[in-house]
């Protein structure tokens, strides 16, 4: 039976300011055994990586059939007990624009997320932030967003990039003043389905303005899966030099099968923070061909096999993915949900 409901969770005690992420041990990464052979010649990878699960927002918003709130709450609660440290629970957007997220407030109030797991929400504008702040005791992080390309930004939020920047740079200090961690997401950072190439210098300039306004973290999104590993490595190598002191996060889509290759390229450049979606759910509902975030299960498996710690229980994560398949009534795109984790014999 899948209509189990989670009891209304008690108000969480939240320490103001950015969430503290406890260092992870390499031994935590070895769910099925780290890769058993040395790989000389490769750049050293980070010892650990932090994963921000965006499936409950980025994944659910793309589903054409309404997902019952009870099911959303149960799936989010399951994710919160996998070892994930950060979960983007929902977005406060207009219900007529994204009907699937019309229950944002109800979901946020009902999820039973334990201490130590950072709750994030996405907001598009001042109205969205005001709605989110009505639930300030249930939130740790608030993300704002815009696109690097003019056409995609018009399609997504009906504003020019400059207009979006003007509004968002006013929101970021308000988020911090509420005791929450402000972050920003830049879509079409590696290419636009309408305009094609997006200059990296343009993306860095947008990111710099957001950082100056108070964004502690900036996520760079490959919105329609146009990025390639060589491009990603060069992009983040320069971004880490251009934006010192800002946490840089990579968000890849697997639209053309290059998602995990791009993750590896970002790791080799020095990035240790990633966004992904359990079951490979999601994408962006507006541009063509934008389906398929990198699957969290596949990402965690690859990281663990390379000896990069995440602190995530892969078996528990797979159980949440299987439950999501049942709720949605179809197989999901995660390779690990089909093949299972790697098992080393001998």
PLM feature spans:
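Residue-identity detector for glycine
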Residues: 17, 31-33
């Amino acid at each position: 039976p899948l209509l189990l409901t989670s009891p209304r969770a008690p108000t969480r005690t939240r320490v103001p300011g950015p969430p503290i992420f406890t260092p992870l041990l390499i031994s935590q990464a070895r769910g099925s055994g780290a890769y058993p052979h040395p790989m000389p010649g490769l750049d050293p990878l980070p010892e650990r990586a932090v994963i921000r699960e965006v499936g409950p927002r980025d994944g659910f918003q793309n589903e054409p059939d309404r997902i019952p709130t009870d099911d959303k709450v149960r799936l989010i609660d399951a994710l919160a007990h996998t070892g994930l440290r950060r979960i983007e629970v929902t977005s406060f957007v207009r219900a007529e624009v994204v009907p699937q997220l019309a229950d944002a407030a109800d979901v946020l109030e009902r999820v039973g997320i334990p201490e130590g797991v950072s709750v994030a929400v996405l907001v598009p504008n001042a109205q969205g932030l005001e709605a989110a702040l009505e639930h300030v005791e249930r939130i740790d992080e608030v993300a704002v967003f815009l696109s690097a390309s003019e056409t995609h930004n018009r399609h997504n939020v009906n504003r020019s990039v400059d207009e979006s920047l003007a509004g968002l740079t006013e929101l970021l200090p308000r988020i911090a003043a509420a005791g929450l961690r402000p972050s920003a997401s830049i879509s079409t950072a590696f290419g636009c389905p309408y305009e094609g190439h997006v200059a990296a210098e343009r993306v860095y300039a947008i990111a710099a303005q957001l950082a100056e306004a108070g964004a502690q973290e900036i996520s760079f999104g490959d919105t329609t899966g146009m990025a390639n590993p060589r491009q990603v490595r060069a992009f983040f190598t320069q971004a880490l030099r251009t934006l010192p002191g800002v946490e840089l996060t990579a968000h890849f889509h697997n639209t053309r099968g290059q998602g995990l290759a791009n993750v590896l390229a970002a790791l080799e450049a020095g990035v240790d923070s990633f966004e992904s979606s359990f079951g490979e759910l999601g994408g962006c509902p507006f541009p063509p061909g934008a389906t398929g975030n990198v699957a969290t299960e596949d990402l965690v498996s690859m990281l663990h096999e390379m000896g990069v710690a995440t602190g995530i229980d892969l078996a528990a994560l797979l159980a949440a993915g299987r439950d999501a398949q049942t709720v949605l009534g179809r197989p999901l795109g995660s390779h690990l949900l089909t093949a299972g984790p790697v098992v080393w014999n001998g």
